């Protein structure tokens, strides 16, 4: 919401900004919880700052590929001209067939106008980063445990990509749901228990 972008806005620079925040707050180590596009940043943080990371929790998240792609989308997200309150509100009836989300989700996205820079940053920088810089995401080198959630009917983040990526995570617990979509609706209690068990096991 109109906060400054750190440097060129790459996941590495965003992770660096989170370290500065933790330093300011006097927090040494954290569990990282990331959803959707935020997965790239959390994974980057865990790789770059293992000494600051207790564990990684990925929730219907973007996932690293298993091999360097020959081509990838340079821009993965809504075009900039649609990133405003009016356009998104008009499109909200299409949220269910396109994204698997209720049209009422629009109210939690408002104000879209103030989020535009972040949406465009995700689409142009964050979302393509694990493909664009495949060699920099040495997932096999992660030194922390990982908990991954995903629903098979997620229309925004590929469940198949998650299944393929699992073998790259050295210490991984995977929780799969038949339904729930990108927001994992209806599985709140199961997710809460899995997260609590994960934290208690590794604390």
Residue ranges and their predicted role:
Residues 1-12:
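Glycine-rich "HGGG/HGxG" loop immediately N-terminal to the catalytic nucleophile
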Residues 13-31:
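Conserved acidic catalytic loop of the alpha/beta-hydrolase fold
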Residues 28-68:
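Conserved hydrolase catalytic core segment
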Residues 56-86:
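Flexible "cap/lid" loop of the alpha/beta hydrolase fold
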Residues 74-78, 82-137:
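Alpha/beta-hydrolase
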Residues 142, 148-150, 154:
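Short beta-strand/loop motif that positions the catalytic acidic residue
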Residues 155-161:
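Conserved alpha/beta-hydrolase "acid-adjacent" motif
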Residues 171-203:
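Catalytic active-site module of serine/aspartate enzymes centered on a nucleophile-bearing elbow/loop
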